Amino acid sequence: PTWLETADKIALIDALSLTGVARIEVSSFVSPKSIPMLRDAAAVFAGITRQCGVIYTALVPNRRGAENALAAGADEINMVMSASETHNKANMRMSCAESLAGFEQIMQAAEGTGGIINGSIATSFGCPFEGGQPAARILGIVHRYMDLGVDGISLADTTGMANPKQVAALVGDVLQLIGPDALTLHFHNTRGMGLANVLAAYQAGARRFDAALGGLGGCPFAPGATGNICTEDLVNMLEEMGIPTNVDLAALIEVSRTLPKLLGHDIPGQLVKAGRNSDRHMLPAS
């Protein structure tokens, strides 16, 4: 993966902050031994220019990460575990039970800080090591998060194994337990079904979705996992369907256009390449 300089990360986040997106995950407070390119998380938080109305979040694996994130000024922390025992041990270096015990410590650390706490469930729609995860297991973790008192829950399709029928069923089940404002869906486009899954989730009642600028991303502990759904492609789809997003799509596209030069390679997103439906082109010379 390409190593972005701290100043470049800050510039990207500052540009994104002006596009109307509601939340930006700034960085992750993980061990620099595990993911060295995230060792500047605190410096990135310190360097960004915050915009009113934007929530700046951080991913945390444990109490130390949560304390560091809150000290750095994260408005929201996202604690994560896998539904799959095997993936959790590969990704988090602990069992699912140990992760849940650690989350109790995170809740204690966050008490009184005013920080928003989100609980994420990785491999909610399938694991590359174990295969499909029973809905009952996902719902059991949702209940555990609710018992802990989290503010929101995310269902993550970490390896892009979800399909629209499966998504609609699980989202419907989870929305029997929590409201749509407390549920986020996190899809990867590994098998080309990312936006189809968004539509299925939306039709089932979900209203919050994670996405990555340019369709970047992945998971170092998931074989073959590619990027998240592309932010500008997602916004474009919703806007074309008449669903308002409050995001300035033109500004978002301009930010995405800076990525290939920064990264030194092309990006998966399609809208930047194809243009919007409203764009008009000259006829080729005969």
Regions found by a protein language model. Name each.
Residues P1-S286:
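Catalytic cores and adjacent flexible loops of soluble metabolic enzymes
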